[in-house]
Amino acid sequence: MPKMKTNKGAAKRFKKTAGGIKYKHATKRHILTKRTTKNKRQLRPNALLPRCEVAAVVRMLPYA
């Protein structure tokens, strides 16, 4: 049986940890002047993926 392919886009965006699958929030790259300080602060920490989306990401990352 051939090796399964890892989805490279998903590999760059998600990291599997003991607590779940970690990812960075979106809309934090550029043009941040219109965003409030509170909003930027809330987007700062990494987030854990919701349970309903874990199965899809795990399929894309077979060796994670």
Swiss-Prot record:
Highest taxon in the source lineage: Bacteria
Protein's GO biological process: translation
Molecular function terms, GO-annotated: structural constituent of ribosome
Cellular component terms (Gene Ontology): cytosolic large ribosomal subunit
Presence of the UniProt keyword Cytoplasm in the record: no
UniProtKB keywords: Ribonucleoprotein, Ribosomal protein
Segment forming the signal sequence: none
Record has Ribonucleoprotein as a keyword: yes
Family note: Belongs to the bacterial ribosomal protein bL35 family.
Official protein name in the record: Large ribosomal subunit protein bL35
Organism expressing this protein natively: Vibrio campbellii (strain ATCC BAA-1116)
